[in-house]
Amino acid sequence: MVTQNKKILIITGSFGNGHMQVTQSIVNQLNDMNLDHLSVIEHDLFMEAHPILTSICKKWYINSFKYFRNMYKGFYYSRPDKLDKCFYKYYGLNKLINLLIKEKPDLILLTFPTPVMSVLTEQFNINIPVATVMTDYRLHKNWITPYSTRYYVATKETKQDFIDVGIDPSTVKVTGIPIDNKFETPINQKQWLIDNNLDPDKQTILMSAGAFGVSKGFDTMITDILAKSANAQVVMICGKSKELKRSLTAKFKSNENVLILGYTKHMNEWMASSQLMITKPGGITITEGFARCIPMIFLNPAPGQELENALYFEEKGFGKIADTPEEAIKIVASLTNGNEQLTNMISTMEQDKIKYATQTICRDLLDLIGHSSQPQEIYGKVPLYARFFVK
């Protein structure tokens, strides 16, 4: 219980929407708890520190999944000693120091891989609890901050990854990845499909085009899925691509088994009302799908965290990897044409999913902050921050 004024500083990043969504889920949950003595502030560290360079890096990151896969693969799978020498480890250092001086937080929460935090925890006794919410299913070195108080991870296998590299097991909690609470609430699937002019007795295949960053080939995929899966209907989410939505709507306007949508705020309802989803294995998207127990097909995952997430879900029986659209269509046909594999996948997900991750994490954060040092004990010593600038 927080009985005196405390402050949580959340450091996040806008490389993709997932980290921001996790941050918002935690902020919303803490706000819902109506804690008068707690303030929560969030900062997109890299964007605030170097807005122009970070914008360029973000564009490269997004395009790397399509055009620069080998380059990103080389970065992601680099040896730890190479990452330690990379400028990325010091990216945003001055901004981070200034944030700590200005905000004087009682706890720092990382929802984005922030290697620069390691510079502070390794070289200075900042005496502030540091916690990390990991948003993927396999460990990468950039998630590790030496001397952290807590890591919140998705699964027991992720925890073992941390233990294998020497992290104290007592600092790693298996909580699941935090997502919006709406993905935990019941949905009337039949009524949702009826309201959207779809047949609740057919198997609904959900496709998220926005996840792929491309706009070609979906018309053929939809046609082939319907041809090879007799009792299927397809919902295509085109995201912000108006051109794709326009072309697909024109092609399938007379087909009652196809619904073409643009950007939607109802992915929760569509996941809850579908039997299978074709998507990219981003950490938050697949966690939302996991919560809704919808088996997934991962189309041509990019090397790095995408591929590692996909391999984990395939290993656990929650999804399947397809290297090509043709392979994805075959998997859809196999799963929807009467065998028990799809039912078994759903059952496995029901058994293994971790509920209410956001609430669990927020309760633990409050426990950590309740045991943290008093502000004057941390910030009353001027030499602490003076050392940052004379190092």
From Swiss-Prot:
GO molecular function: 1,2-diacylglycerol 3-glucosyltransferase activity
Entry GO CC: plasma membrane
Subcellular location field: Cell membrane
Pfam families: Glyco_tran_28_C, MGDG_synth
Summary of the function given for this chain in its UniProt record: Processive glucosyltransferase involved in the biosynthesis of both the bilayer- and non-bilayer-forming membrane glucolipids. Is able to successively transfer two glucosyl residues to diacylglycerol (DAG), thereby catalyzing the formation of beta-monoglucosyl-DAG (3-O-(beta-D-glucopyranosyl)-1,2-diacyl-sn-glycerol) and beta-diglucosyl-DAG (3-O-(beta-D-glucopyranosyl-beta-(1->6)-D-glucopyranosyl)-1,2-diacyl-sn-glycerol). Beta-diglucosyl-DAG is the predominant glycolipid found in Bacillales and is also used as a membrane anchor for lipoteichoic acid (LTA).
EC number: 2.4.1.315
The protein's name in its UniProt record: Processive diacylglycerol beta-glucosyltransferase
Gene3D superfamilies: Glycogen Phosphorylase B
pH effects: Optimum pH is 7.5.
Substrates-to-products reaction catalysed: a 1,2-diacyl-3-O-(beta-D-glucopyranosyl)-sn-glycerol + UDP-alpha-D-glucose = a 1,2-diacyl-3-O-(beta-D-Glc-(1->6)-beta-D-Glc)-sn-glycerol + UDP + H(+); a 1,2-diacyl-sn-glycerol + UDP-alpha-D-glucose = a 1,2-diacyl-3-O-(beta-D-glucopyranosyl)-sn-glycerol + UDP + H(+)
Record pathway: Glycolipid metabolism; diglucosyl-diacylglycerol biosynthesis
Keywords (A to Z) from UniProt: Carbohydrate metabolism, Cell membrane, Glycosyltransferase, Lipid biosynthesis, Lipid metabolism, Membrane, Transferase
Loss of function: phenotype: Cells lacking this gene are defective in beta-diglucosyl-DAG and are smaller than wild-type. Diacylglycerol (DAG) is the anchor of the LTA in the mutant.
Family from the record: Belongs to the glycosyltransferase 28 family. UgtP subfamily.
Enzyme class: transferase
Species for this entry: Staphylococcus aureus (strain NCTC 8325 / PS 47)
GO BP terms in the entry: enterobacterial common antigen biosynthetic process; glycolipid biosynthetic process; lipoteichoic acid biosynthetic process
CDD domains found in the cross-reference section: GT28_Beta-DGS-like
UniProt xrefs under PANTHER family: MONOGALACTOSYLDIACYLGLYCEROL SYNTHASE, MONOGALACTOSYLDIACYLGLYCEROL SYNTHASE 1, CHLOROPLASTIC
